[in-house]
C-alpha cells in the first residue's frame, strides 16, 4: 500500500478482512483470513496478481499451499515451513538438530511430568505454549506456584488450545528482532529492530503481541548482526531446505544477545 501511489504497476489493492483504518487505501473484502477456499476464489475472480499474507494462522493452515495449487502467486511459506513459527517445539528441535544457538529446553504434553521437571529447576524459568497464541503464549514464572498456575492454564485448561508446552532455560540480555526475506537458502536481511512485548512500563506485566518497536538498535553491533545472520538466520534457512520444507517468505527471528 505504501508504494501504490508511486507505482504505475499497482492498479488495485484488496484487504481481507480489512478495517475502517485501511479502507482509504484498499478495498476491504468481507472474508476472514481463515476462509482459504473463498480467498482463493476471490483471487481468481478478481485477477489478483500477488497475495501477501501477514498473520501466522492462515499460513499454518496452508493458505500458501492452496494458492500455489490454484496457480496463484502468494508471498508466504507453506504450512510445513510455517511450523518454524507455529510450533515452538518444531523450531527448538530444528535448532538442536542443526546446531543453531538456542536456550536449552524440554517439551511436555503432560501436566504432572512438566510439574515434576520444573520443580527440580531454579527460577525464573520460561514456559512457552507450543502453538500460536497471538504473542501471549510465553510466561516467565518467578516462583514454583506461578509455574503451577501457568502450566495448569496451558496443559489442563487448554487456555490457548490443546497442545504442548516447551520449558526453556531463562536467559538474560537485550532482546532484538531480525527479519529476513528468505527464498530457500537465499537470505536477504532487513534492519534489526527491538520490540516491547510486556504490557506495562519498565518491561513489566504479561507478554502481548507487541506494544511498540524501534530501529536501529544501538546495543546490537555490526558484529552481532553479522554473527546472527550467518549462524542463525542462514543456518535456519539451510536447515529448512535440508528438512524438505524450504521457507519462502519473511522469516522472523526473536533473539537475545
Where do the PLM segments sit?
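A conserved helix-loop-beta module that forms one wall/lid of the active-site cleft
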Residues: 75-137
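ATP-binding N-terminal substructure of ATP-dependent carboxylate-amine bond-forming enzymes
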Residues: 1-79, 112
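Glycine-rich phosphate-binding loop signature in dinucleotide/nucleotide-binding domains
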Residues: 43-48, 120-121, 161
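Short, charged, surface-exposed secondary-structure boundary motifs
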Residues: 24-25, 40, 83-89, 200-202
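General beta-strand structural signal in soluble alpha/beta enzymes
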Residues: 15-16, 52-53, 74-77, 104-107, ...
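Internal nucleotide-binding/catalytic subdomain
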Residues: 140-257
Amino acid at each position: 500500500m505504501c508504494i501504490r501511489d508511486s507505482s504505475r504497476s499497482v492498479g488495485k489493492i484488496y484487504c481481507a478482512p480489512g478495517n475502517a483504518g485501511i479502507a482509504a487505501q484498499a478495498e476491504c473484502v468481507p472474508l476472514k483470513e481463515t476462509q482459504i477456499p473463498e480467498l482463493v476464489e476471490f483471487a481468481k475472480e478478481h485477477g489478483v496478481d500477488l497475495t501477501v499474507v501477514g498473520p501466522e494462522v492462515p499460513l499454518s493452515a496452508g493458505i500458501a499451499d492452496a494458492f500455489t495449487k490454484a496457480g496463484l502467486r502468494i508471498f508466504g511459506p507453506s504450512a510445513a515451513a510455517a511450523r518454524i513459527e507455529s510450533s515452538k517445539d518444531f523450531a527448538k528441535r530444528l535448532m538442536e538438530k542443526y546446531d543453531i544457538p538456542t536456550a536449552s529446553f524440554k517439551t511436555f504434553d503432560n501436566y504432572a511430568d512438566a510439574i515434576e521437571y520444573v520443580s527440580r529447576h531454579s527460577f525464573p524459568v520460561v514456559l512457552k505454549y507450543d502453538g500460536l497464541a497471538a504473542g501471549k503464549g510465553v510466561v516467565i514464572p518467578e516462583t514454583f506456584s506461578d509455574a503451577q498456575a501457568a502450566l495448569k492454564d496451558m496443559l489442563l485448561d487448554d487456555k490457548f488450545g490443546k497442545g504442548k508446552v516447551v520449558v526453556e532455560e531463562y536467559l538474560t540480555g537485550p532482546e532484538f528482532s531480525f527479519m529476513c526475506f528468505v527464498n530457500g537458502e537465499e537470505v536477504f536481511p532487513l534492519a534489526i529492530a527491538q520490540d516491547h512485548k510486556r504490557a506495562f512500563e519498565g518491561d513489566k506485566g504479561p507478554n502481548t503481541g507487541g506494544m511498540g518497536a524501534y530501529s536501529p538498535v544501538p546495543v546490537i553491533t555490526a558484529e552481532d548482526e553479522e554473527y546472527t545472520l550467518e549462524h542463525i538466520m542462514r543456518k535456519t534457512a539451510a536447515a529448512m531446505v535440508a528438512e524438505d520444507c524450504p521457507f519462502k517468505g519473511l522469516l522472523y527471528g526473536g533473539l537475545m544477545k
